[in-house]
């Protein structure tokens, strides 16, 4: 049972809607407040909030139909209220999730505006996907309670939340945030304060490379997406990237990187220093007993069999699904 009771979500956009849906799916007795702090024309103050409410209701109905919601959608909706402006929506809250647009000045102004009215132990958690904590701490009078909590869309489905902390973050703020996320069924990880954290940095690199391949005329958009869904991305549902490097063999990545760098003359293809160092040491993965992970005492054959089983389970799931597909692009069922 979580000790957090009143949670405020600032911003009625897609991320705010996703977080609200996730919290309403939680069986914990949370009271949620969605707050729109954007100044709007008279008579339009609640327009964005009304739209957000409709989308949250739609999400809950879908989850209910799929058996993923324990309560009736209407019962879940009774735990959320909608507010325009800074006043009521932020009073007595223990956690504030900020989901405003990715504009540093806008987020800084928000922190300056709300801090005086918050309880000293209230946590401010920005859902930014790229902005570092130092940007927030510059304007904060209490930087020890500020963290970033980067959810991934759709936030009510994707388990991961990246929690970024800085040297100024108090242990109680980090611990409370991670504990709360675990209690509502999420998978939090902790990262040091750095622009882009983990997922956005990897995503940006991969997305730009996909667009580069498209612009070069190497493949169609549909075939690029099929390649990701049926190949690269398929494996990532079972293997993390670092584990993938180990299991494939660090020497494979080393030689592939050298070849691509020689062909393209672009620095992003250069082998990383730790890859070069491990090549020198002969730390190539399971077959040498160590790569990035230590495989001492690990039965490599058994480990590979377990991964193969997981791949086959995933493959069969896709093959027998009415909604999953390896096909890239817009599909008939989308129309």
Predicted regions and their residues:
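NAD(P)+-binding Rossmann beta1-loop-alpha1 motif at the extreme N-terminus of oxidoreductases
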Residues: 1-62, 66, 117
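Rossmann-like NAD(P)-binding element
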Residues: 37-50, 62-123, 131
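Hydrophobic packing residues within well-ordered alpha-helices of enzyme cores
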Residues: 23, 114, 136-137
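NAD(P)-dependent Rossmann-like dehydrogenase/reductase catalytic/cofactor-binding core
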Residues: 2-5, 10, 26-28, 175, ...
């Amino acid at each position: 049972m979580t000790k957090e009771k009143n949670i405020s979500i600032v911003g009625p956009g897609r991320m705010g809607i996703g977080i609200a849906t996730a919290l309403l799916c939680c069986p914990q007795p949370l009271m949620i407040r969605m707050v729109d702090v954007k100044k709007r024309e008279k008579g339009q103050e609640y327009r964005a909030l009304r739209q957000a409410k409709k989308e949250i209701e739609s999400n809950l109905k879908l989850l209910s139909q799929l058996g993923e919601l324990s309560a009736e959608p209407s019962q879940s909706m009774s735990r959320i209220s909608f507010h325009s402006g800074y006043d009521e929506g932020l009073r007595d809250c223990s956690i504030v999730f900020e989901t405003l647009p990715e504009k540093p000045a806008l987020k800084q102004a928000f922190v300056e505006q709300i801090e005086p009215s918050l309880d000293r132990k209230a946590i401010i958690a920005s859902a930014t996907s790229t902005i570092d904590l130092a940007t927030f701490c510059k304007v904060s009078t209490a930087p020890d309670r500020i963290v970033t909590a980067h959810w991934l869309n759709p936030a009510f489905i994707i388990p991961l939340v990246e929690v970024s902390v800085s040297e100024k973050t108090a242990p109680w703020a980090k611990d409370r945030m991670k504990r709360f996320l675990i209690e509502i069924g999420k998978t939090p990880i902790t990262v040091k304060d750095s622009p882009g954290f983990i997922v956005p940095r990897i995503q940006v690199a991969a997305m730009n490379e996909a667009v580069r391949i498209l612009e070069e005329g190497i493949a169609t958009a549909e075939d690029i997406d099929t390649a990701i869904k049926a190949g690269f991305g398929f494996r990532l549902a079972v293997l993390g990237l670092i584990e993938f490097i180990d299991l494939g063999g660090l020497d494979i990545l080393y030689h592939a990187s050298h070849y691509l760098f020689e062909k393209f003359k672009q620095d992003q293809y250069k082998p990383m220093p730790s890859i070069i160092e491990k090549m020198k040491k002969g730390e190539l993965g399971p077959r040498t007993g160590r790569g990035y992970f230590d495989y001492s005492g690990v039965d490599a054959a058994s480990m590979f069999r377990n991964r193969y089983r997981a791949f086959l389970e995933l493959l069969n799931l896709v093959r027998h699904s009415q909604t999953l597909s390896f096909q890239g692009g817009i599909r008939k069922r989308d129309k």
